[in-house]
Swiss-Prot record:
<keyword id="KW-0699">rRNA-binding</keyword>
<comment type="subunit">
    <text>Part of the 50S ribosomal subunit.</text>
</comment>
<comment type="similarity">
    <text>Belongs to the universal ribosomal protein uL22 family.</text>
</comment>
<dbReference type="InterPro" id="IPR036394">
    <property type="entry name" value="Ribosomal_uL22_sf"/>
</dbReference>
<keyword id="KW-0694">RNA-binding</keyword>
<dbReference type="GO" id="GO:0019843">
    <property type="term" value="F:rRNA binding"/>
</dbReference>
<dbReference type="GO" id="GO:0006412">
    <property type="term" value="P:translation"/>
</dbReference>
<comment type="function">
    <text>The globular domain of the protein is located near the polypeptide exit tunnel on the outside of the subunit, while an extended beta-hairpin is found that lines the wall of the exit tunnel in the center of the 70S ribosome.</text>
</comment>
<dbReference type="Pfam" id="PF00237">
    <property type="entry name" value="Ribosomal_L22"/>
</dbReference>
<dbReference type="GO" id="GO:0022625">
    <property type="term" value="C:cytosolic large ribosomal subunit"/>
</dbReference>
<keyword id="KW-0689">Ribosomal protein</keyword>
<dbReference type="InterPro" id="IPR047867">
    <property type="entry name" value="Ribosomal_uL22_bac/org-type"/>
</dbReference>
<comment type="function">
    <text>This protein binds specifically to 23S rRNA; its binding is stimulated by other ribosomal proteins, e.g. L4, L17, and L20. It is important during the early stages of 50S assembly. It makes multiple contacts with different domains of the 23S rRNA in the assembled 50S subunit and ribosome.</text>
</comment>
<keyword id="KW-0687">Ribonucleoprotein</keyword>
<protein>
    <recommendedName>
        <fullName>Large ribosomal subunit protein uL22</fullName>
    </recommendedName>
</protein>
<dbReference type="GO" id="GO:0003735">
    <property type="term" value="F:structural constituent of ribosome"/>
</dbReference>
<dbReference type="InterPro" id="IPR005727">
    <property type="entry name" value="Ribosomal_uL22_bac/chlpt-type"/>
</dbReference>
Amino acid sequence: MSKPKRERSLPDNEAKAIARMLRVSPQKLNLVAQLIRGRKASAALADLQFSRKRIAVDVKKCLESAIANAENNHDLDVDALIVSEAHVGKGIVMKRFAPRGRGRSGRIFKPFAQLTIVVRQVEAEASA
């Protein structure tokens, strides 16, 4: 006897992907997440392709994963997808030390963040 299957937390027309342990501050990651929020998936991919931010590569990977989840796991139309959510969460903060003069030391904070992207399929009448 196995455990009962957990109910799906998203509606049937949505798919999501989560990128964890991204080595960037949540504030900088949110700048890139704001670019793609509410946009069509294809336009968001194009924006990330030509963004000069370092973390845009990881955001693009996460968006491509969400699109692949929508297509393969939920049978959604890739051309009708929009980025309905792109939210950023805090991760751990690694603390390192840097030697300073006179025997002192300074702290270096190395923050991590996580990104959740939810894509939703819009109907033909809504996108027209």
